[in-house]
Structures are given as C-alpha cells and as structure tokens.
Amino acid sequence: MVCGGFSCSKNCLCALNLLYTLVSLLLIGIAAWGIGFGLISSLRVVGVVIAVGIFLFLIALVGLIGAVKHHQVLLFFYMIILLLVFIVQFSVSCACLALNREQQGQLLEVGWNNTASARNDIQRNLNCCGFRNYNPNDTCPASCAKSNQKCSSCAPIIGEYAGEVLRFVGGIGLFFSFTEILGVWLTYRYRNQKDPRANPSAFL
C-alpha cells in the first residue's frame, strides 16, 4: 500500500502523537527532577513547564485516540488545537531567533526583577550578585558574597549564554512547529479517508 493510504496515514499520526507523548513526559520529568534535586526553586518556572507538559500530553492523547478509532470529532478538535499551537509556537520561535543583544538584555532584566527565587538560583549557581550592579546591602546567596570576596554582576555572564539558549529554543521550536503543521495535514487527510475495513455504506 502506498504511503498516502489509510493505514499509512493512521500509523504516521499515531507515531507523531507518541513522539508528543514522550516529549510531554520528558518535560514533566525534567521539572520534577530539577525541583527534587534543588536545581530549580522557582515554583512558577516548574509550574509552567509541568503545565506545558500536561497540555502537550492531553493533545497527544486526543490525537492518539482519534487516530486509532478514526473518530471524526476528536480528529477535528485535535486538528484545530494543533493549528493554534503551531501559530503560537512558530511566532515565539521566530521571535527567539530575531532578538538582538539589546532586546535580550531588556527581557533578561525584566525577568530578573520579577522572579526572586529564580534570581537567587542564578546568583548561587553562577556565583554572581546583582544584575548590572551589586549593592553590598542586598542579600546574595552566592559564595563570593558569603566569603566577602568581590562579586561580579550577573548580566555579562547570563548574556554569554542567552543568545545560545534563544537560538537553541528557537530552533527546537521551529522543528516542532513543522511537525505540528505536518500533524494538521495528516489529520485533515486521514479524516477524509475511508477505513477499508468499515461498512462500505457507512459515512467515512
């Protein structure tokens, strides 16, 4: 049977949703591992990662059930949700790749000022204090501050990695964006194909 047939479309759609399921479980596992080993203390960051993982898992589950049962309603909603996710993810990925150093610095400073727990994690792990300037009167968990040594600011250190991280995130996001649009196309195609084992007089 050619790859455009019913069975091939079904198998491809199932494989794609199994991939999404593995990615979602990986996200949830990484978040739990990070907070369990004390690498991440920000409940907000962990909550967002886990929420994204659960959302992706639910989408994959809907797509998998719809593909296995050739369920028209589930496949329709799966296709619409996947299209919306593609639009958002593609836009965010392009934005990550398009940000220049000045814009990266502005975003990092906003995030720095709004997340106290993540800020403490960064200062402790990178052994730096303050974003651009360090005030000795401020509390800093870095080892340099505890030993009364001179502490460097965190902005230059974070800036070295920010561009690489954004390019990595943008590239991964673009990859999954194209898998999502592939999923939309496969779902649309699969919905309009007739199961060869079904009743010939039945509708799809």
Curated annotation (Swiss-Prot):
Q: Which residues form a coiled coil?
A: none
Which stretches of this protein does UniProt put in the Extracellular compartment? 41-44, 94-167
Entry's transmembrane regions: 20-40, 45-65, 73-93, 168-188
Task: Tell me which residues are glycosylated.
Answer: 113, 137
**Which Pfam families does this one have?**
Tetraspanin (PF00335)
Q: Which molecular-function annotations from GO does this UniProt entry contain?
A: calcium channel regulator activity
Per the record, what is one GO cellular component? plasma membrane
Any one Gene Ontology BP term:
regulation of calcium ion transmembrane transport
What membrane topology term does the record carry? Multi-pass membrane protein
Location of the protein in the cell: Membrane
Q: Which residues carry this modification: Phosphoserine?
A: 143
Q: Which UniProt keywords apply?
A: Glycoprotein, Membrane, Phosphoprotein, Transmembrane, Transmembrane helix
Q: Which residues lie on this side of the membrane: Cytoplasmic?
A: 1-19, 66-72, 189-204
Describe the family membership recorded for this protein in Swiss-Prot or TrEMBL: Belongs to the tetraspanin (TM4SF) family.
State the name under which the record lists this protein.
Tetraspanin-13
Report the source organism: Rattus norvegicus
Gene name?
A: Tspan13
